[in-house]
């Protein structure tokens, strides 16, 4: 319901305005004060020995940050760089922090997105509620550069390049601060970052268009790959920031979806609640992020759909050139 208030101008937003507006003012004040403390030197931000690239947003919820992180890691690896990824590890509970993921780390330990990034890229991935602690651990691993998955508002960490990922369809909703609206920071923040990435729809001025390109569906048990349109009837579910985006993608691929089910982002699934979805059909399809949480109890009729971030070639090169330029300023060789 809260997202209907934020993005759909629901009547409940007007009814709850007297309650939510003062809380939004308080959120804005606290957020601005926290930021100002670092900008004025009242608090000291950690300066890494390697370049730090932040991929974040100014709204609550999922905007497509993780595919951007994966794309950046893979592109920089092709340049010969040893890349590390820092994350808060939301949804996981590690035995200690900072925590360095291994190839066998599960989402209940580190959260779903760090596991996805680790599996996709084989990069060093560290999690910690205080992201600067994760960055320090990655420095100990000898990385050349660190990318943080989210963390735009984590001003305790100095950064060299900033990305804001924008949901091209929902944009900034009612443009109010949390909890009346989705904003973590004001729209003026857009002018201070290096790159604005528009996920879907038509980008505005100074924004770079990004599309999420789906590939073939992958079977969770066998690893078999098939075109979504050839799978037959499917029950689709998604526990991401905006589940309808996933369902729209399936529709664009001519998937035969007979039932959809959205869950909250980062939800820890119980085996039975997923298996219960099979009452609507014999085959399930999910996002790659959900697949890492369902892998341990998956059945042979379950599939996931990987997606990859895609940018216009000229813009992609512009992004890479900026990061390489910053890295060279640190005096680090990419060979």
Curated annotation (Swiss-Prot):
Name of the protein in its database record: Tetraacyldisaccharide 4'-kinase
Domain of life where this protein originates: Bacteria
GO molecular function, a single term: tetraacyldisaccharide 4'-kinase activity
GO biological process annotation, one example: lipid A biosynthetic process
Family: Belongs to the LpxK family.
InterPro entries: LpxK, P-loop_NTPase
Binding site for ATP: 59-66
Organism lineage: Bacteria, Pseudomonadati, Pseudomonadota, Gammaproteobacteria, Vibrionales
UniProt keyword annotation of Chaperone present: no
Gene source species: Aliivibrio salmonicida (strain LFI1238) (Vibrio salmonicida (strain LFI1238))
Keyword annotations from UniProtKB, A to Z: ATP-binding, Kinase, Lipid A biosynthesis, Lipid biosynthesis, Lipid metabolism, Nucleotide-binding, Transferase
EC number: 2.7.1.130
Pathway listed: Glycolipid biosynthesis; lipid IV(A) biosynthesis; lipid IV(A) from (3R)-3-hydroxytetradecanoyl-[acyl-carrier-protein] and UDP-N-acetyl-alpha-D-glucosamine: step 6/6
Signal peptide span: none
NCBIfam families listed in its UniProt record: lpxK
Catalytic activity from the UniProt record: a lipid A disaccharide + ATP = a lipid IVA + ADP + H(+)
PANTHER family cross-referenced by the UniProt entry: TETRAACYLDISACCHARIDE 4'-KINASE (PTHR42724), TETRAACYLDISACCHARIDE 4'-KINASE, MITOCHONDRIAL-RELATED (PTHR42724:SF1)
Job of this protein: Transfers the gamma-phosphate of ATP to the 4'-position of a tetraacyldisaccharide 1-phosphate intermediate (termed DS-1-P) to form tetraacyldisaccharide 1,4'-bis-phosphate (lipid IVA).
Gene Ontology CC annotations of this record: plasma membrane
